[in-house]
């Protein structure tokens, strides 16, 4: 009887192994504009954060070091590997000389990750 319980417990753990990678996973951060910089359309700066687990995360968009108060946040979604994704965006003027950054705080990071929007590599 004890051997059966041991085998069942071992099989249960083996079934769980593929999901261990998702227990903690650091976020990947991309900052880009919704439309090309030279278009005359109303534009948005986007911060797409992907591949993180657990789902608790803080994402802030800033203009010249000041947090942008009104941002749009997508619902939290997840990928096939059970890591999470979120998009945060705000209207902006890409032709201004302002600096836009995205700051991500997550338990897998020793310090927040800050990524600057680069109009040259958009």
UniProtKB/Swiss-Prot annotation:
A Pfam family of this chain: C1-set
Signal peptide range in chain numbering: 1-22
Name this polypeptide is given: Beta-2-microglobulin
Entry keyword RNA-binding: no
Species of origin: Trichosurus vulpecula
Family to which this protein belongs: Belongs to the beta-2-microglobulin family.
Residue intervals passing through the bilayer: none
Function: Component of the class I major histocompatibility complex (MHC). Involved in the presentation of peptide antigens to the immune system.
Positions of the Ig-like C1-type domain: 27-115
GO biological process, any: antigen processing and presentation of peptide antigen via MHC class I
Underlying gene: B2M
Subunit structure: Heterodimer of an alpha chain and a beta chain. Beta-2-microglobulin is the beta-chain of major histocompatibility complex class I molecules.
GO CC list: extracellular region; MHC class I protein complex
């Amino acid at each position: 009887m004890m051997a059966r319980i041991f085998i069942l417990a071992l099989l249960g753990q083996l079934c769980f192994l593929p999901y261990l990678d998702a227990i903690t996973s650091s976020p990947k951060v991309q900052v880009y504009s919704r439309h090309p910089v030279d278009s005359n359309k109303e534009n948005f700066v986007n911060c797409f954060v992907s591949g993180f687990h657990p789902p608790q995360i803080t994402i802030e968009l800033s203009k010249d070091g000041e947090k942008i108060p009104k941002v749009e946040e997508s619902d939290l979604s997840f990928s096939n590997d059970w890591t999470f994704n979120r998009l945060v965006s705000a209207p902006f003027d890409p032709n201004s000389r302002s600096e836009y950054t995205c700051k991500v705080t997550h338990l897998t990071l020793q310090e927040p990750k800050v990524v600057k929007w680069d109009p040259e590599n958009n």
